């Protein structure tokens, strides 16, 4: 299983960013603040809906935070397109700021649920001996938090 396409609309610094991804390797390079982490966070948000529904049917994934909505906009939308053994499927997730109308903007997570059900059925059918998707995510805030203010030894 791999991501074919990821689309960020009004998400953080991106107004409308469709990304066609390679099935083998994708490298994101850029200066600080250009959106590399936003792309990875958007992927993590979208894949969390599948991962959580594999664990528990109907479970929710990570929502788009109101702070993720682009400044000056009333809503944000993320869409993901995946491919698994030649079958393409996807879902989208929307968030509207408080006080704004949700008209014409809705999350559609049917294929996340259907895919999770298929994976759950495979796990049950093969007594847990089945390959399942692996999603690894390391956020930016992984820095060392405890740095001594003084040096204790002479160098």
Language-model segments: residues:
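P-loop NTPase switch/coupling surface
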Residues: 1-155
């Amino acid at each position: 299983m791999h991501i074919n396409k990821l689309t960020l609309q009004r998400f953080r610094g991106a107004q409308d960013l469709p990304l066609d991804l390679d099935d083998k390797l994708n490298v994101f390079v850029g200066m600080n603040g250009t959106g590399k982490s936003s792309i990875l966070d958007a992927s993590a948000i979208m894949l969390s809906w599948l991962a959580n529904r594999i664990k528990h049917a109907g479970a929710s994934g990570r929502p788009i935070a109101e702070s993720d909505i682009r400044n000056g906009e009333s809503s944000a939308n993320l869409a993901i397109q995946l491919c698994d053994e030649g079958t393409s499927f996807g879902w989208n997730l929307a968030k509207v700021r408080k006080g704004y109308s949700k008209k014409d903007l809705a999350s559609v997570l049917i294929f996340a649920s259907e895919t999770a059900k298929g994976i759950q059925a495979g796990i049950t059918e093969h007594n847990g001996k089945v390959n399942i998707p692996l999603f690894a995510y390391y956020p930016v805030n992984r820095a060392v938090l405890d740095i001594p203010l003084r040096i204790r030894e002479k160098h």
